Amino acid sequence: MLALGKLLELTLTAHEPAEKTQVTPGGARLRWLGEGALEVRPAESEDCGLDLLLSAGIHGNETAPIELLERLLHGVANGKIKPRARVLFLFGNPAAIRKGERFIEQDINRLFNGRHELSSGFEALRAAELEQFARVFFSKPGRNRLHYDLHTAIRGSKIEQFALYPYKEGRKHSRRELARLAAAGMEAVLLQSKSSITFSAFTYEQLEAEAFTLELGKARPFGQNEQVNLDKLEERLIRIIEATEPENESSLDGLQLFSVSREIIKHSDSFHLHLPADIENFSELSKGYLLAEDLAEMRWVVEEEGARIIFPNPKVKNGLRAGILIVPDSGQRLG
């Protein structure tokens, strides 16, 4: 296997390879771009016109997606996977990956779309670097652009594998992309309705990629991910890389759609979230339930039918989102 296929090993040891470019027997070119960043370019005659960005390790303790990217890269490097798409593999937060921690100083997935310019420290610098990797990768005109940012979570979930689809005014969410997600094993998709500061929101809003945050199960240490079943996703990613997907895929069978009803914003240290600490994502909340309270008698009461909560976190910094209230979506606005 080509040495550059061992990107995870290089990242874990903070090692810079002596040889920055290698070529597979099939003509695919592997190029090391910087720490945790490697581009795969197919032979020119095989190029299908897709640029695929696969990122993992934005949070350093979310290891199952990192291991998945490592398997895919090994497959390319040993010739078992024959790429027809350009692929950029990114390990988002190398320092946190080495420590097995979510982050070093602050959550890097709250520092995109310009937020890093308002901050300082290691993660702010890395967020700017990741944006630049993506900006250069997606700079070629006339090509299809797709970004999957892969995550796992400490919190349990009623729906284990789901995607978040970013928002941009005037742009419709794609039914074709949702069908692709359904085929990849996603059980639900949250259709977002406002701009965000995550990595996938940056590539969707600023770089015109189809982009998604994929939540894939529980976060566990390296080598302990047997219960995180990524078989369908891995199979689909190989088909995307090799350009062997079915044509005109449109079935959304088994895929639940949700939209954001409200975001719960923590305004002060007096904020209190009235939920059990171990509540699972997608837990249903009854109408009339007092969800949260803050200063000046600010109250969040559930008014929506079929409401569910995701990403509840009362420990976030003031001014940030402490939870999202979501409701079922009919999908009538899909493009």
From Swiss-Prot:
Recorded superkingdom: Bacteria
GO molecular function, one term: succinylglutamate desuccinylase activity
GO biological process: arginine catabolic process to glutamate; arginine catabolic process to succinate
Residues at which Zn(2+) binds: 59, 62, 151
Keyword Zinc carried by entry: yes
Gene3D superfamilies: Zn peptidases
Reactions catalysed: N-succinyl-L-glutamate + H2O = L-glutamate + succinate
Cofactor remark: Binds 1 zinc ion per subunit.
Catalytic residues (positions): 215
Entry keyword set: Arginine metabolism, Hydrolase, Metal-binding, Zinc
Cofactor dependence: Zn(2+)
The keyword Metal-binding appears for this protein: yes
Pfam families, per database record: AstE_AspA_cat (PF24827), AstE_AspA_hybrid (PF04952)
Pathway field: Amino-acid degradation; L-arginine degradation via AST pathway; L-glutamate and succinate from L-arginine: step 5/5
Entry EC number(s): 3.5.1.96
Function per UniProt: Transforms N(2)-succinylglutamate into succinate and glutamate.
HAMAP family with a match to the protein in the record: Arg_catab_AstE
Family recorded in the similarity comment: Belongs to the AspA/AstE family. Succinylglutamate desuccinylase subfamily.
PANTHER family: ASPARTOACYLASE (PTHR15162), SUCCINYLGLUTAMATE DESUCCINYLASE (PTHR15162:SF7)
Protein name: Succinylglutamate desuccinylase
